[in-house]
């Protein structure tokens, strides 16, 4: 009992220390929020000089210098789509390529928020269209992740690289995995390699099959993606069978997927399909039924035309019915 009484003062002192730390934290947070609101008020009201002074004191930078703070006024304006505030800050001389500790630029923020007008303003002011974060993410990757075809098109027009090294995050794979087929369509129109394989992800077609994104799978196959290329020895058909996606399995088979392809474990697509499932029945039926002559002819002609020239099929001097047939329409 006496031991508890001796320890009580120390416990009270310790609790007082924690209470003091918490109070200081809350006070600093209140000050920061107040300054941010005040800075925004001055920007909106057009008092550029006062806004610049508050921003410089708050973020510890001067006009024209890069920001290594966690967030700069440009980042906030771009992420929230506040075009007027963004233009005001740029007119004050703030660095359009200001970065955070993770190398995130205002352009990254604008694209992630699908703020096309802000992205255009930043690009016109000289923003680095191929800026890379510490994680290897580009503004184009953010646009495709968000599903913003307008931002993606804008970035490509300003010189964004549609595909980078295989070790960096891929806009194509991101669009395919999230089902953003409009972004994928734009990337394809800019000449990406639809069969780009990233070691830990596989090809865009494989990623789309794993995510069961039918429209993206159709876009990739229509653009000439190799129906056999997946992740290592796993084919897209393995992925579709594993996900029990009958619609995707039928589509892959229509484009010539090999049902006898084996992965690293020597398993065929039918072996990874759920037992007694519809996918298993489809694969068994396809295995027992030879491909029709017209399907084999279509695959042969498309292969002869070649992936880079498939988009020219509508220009061939052929009957419309035959052109539609070659385009799976």
UniProtKB/Swiss-Prot annotation:
GO biological process annotation, one example: intracellular signal transduction
Alphabetized SMART domains for the sequence: ANK, SOCS_box
Annotated SOCS box domain residues: 278-329
ANK repeats by residue range: 69-98, 102-131, 135-164, 167-196, 200-229, 232-261
Keywords of this entry: ANK repeat, Repeat, Ubl conjugation pathway
Pathway of action: Protein modification; protein ubiquitination
GO cellular component labels: cytosol
Family: Belongs to the ankyrin SOCS box (ASB) family.
Domain comment, as recorded: The SOCS box domain mediates the interaction with the Elongin BC complex, an adapter module in different E3 ubiquitin-protein ligase complexes.
Function of the protein: May be a substrate-recognition component of a SCF-like ECS (Elongin-Cullin-SOCS-box protein) E3 ubiquitin-protein ligase complex which mediates the ubiquitination and subsequent proteasomal degradation of target proteins. May play a role in the initiation of arteriogenesis.
Name of the protein in question: Ankyrin repeat and SOCS box protein 5
Lineage: Eukaryota, Metazoa, Chordata, Craniata, Vertebrata
């Amino acid at each position: 009992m006496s031991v508890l009484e001796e320890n009580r003062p120390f416990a009270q002192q310790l609790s007082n220390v924690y209470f003091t730390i918490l109070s200081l934290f809350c006070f600093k947070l209140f000050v920061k929020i107040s300054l941010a609101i005040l800075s925004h008020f001055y920007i909106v009201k057009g008092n550029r000089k006062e806004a610049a002074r508050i921003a410089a004191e708050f973020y510890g930078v001067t006009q024209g210098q890069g920001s290594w703070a966690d967030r700069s006024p440009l980042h906030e304006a771009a992420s929230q789509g506040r075009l007027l505030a963004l233009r005001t800050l740029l007119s004050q001389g703030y660095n359009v390529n200001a970065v955070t500790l993770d190398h995130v630029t205002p352009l990254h923020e604008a694209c992630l928020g699908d703020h096309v007008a802000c992205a255009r303003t930043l690009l016109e002011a000289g923003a680095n269209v191929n800026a890379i974060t510490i994680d290897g993410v580009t503004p184009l990757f953010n646009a495709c992740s968000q599903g913003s075809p307008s931002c993606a098109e804008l970035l490509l027009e300003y010189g964004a690289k549609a595909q980078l090294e295989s070790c960096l995050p891929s806009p194509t794979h991101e669009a395919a995995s999230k089902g953003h087929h409009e972004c994928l369509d734009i990337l394809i129109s800019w000449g990406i390699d639809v069969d780009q394989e990233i070691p830990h992800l596989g090809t865009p077609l494989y990623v789309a099959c794993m995510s069961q994104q039918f429209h993206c799978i159709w876009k990739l196959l229509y653009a000439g993606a190799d129906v056999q290329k997946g992740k290592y020895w796993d084919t897209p058909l393995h992925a579709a069978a594993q996900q029990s996606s009958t619609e995707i399995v039928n589509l892959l088979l229509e484009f010539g997927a090999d049902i006898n392809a084996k992965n690293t474990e020597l398993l065929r697509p039918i072996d990874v399909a759920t037992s007694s499932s519809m996918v298993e029945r489809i694969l068994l039926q396809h295995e027992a039924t030879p491909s029709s002559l017209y399907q084999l002819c279509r695959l042969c002609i498309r292969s002869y035309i070649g992936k880079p020239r498939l988009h020219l099929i509508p220009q061939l001097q052929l009957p419309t019915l035959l052109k539609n047939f070659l385009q799976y329409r």
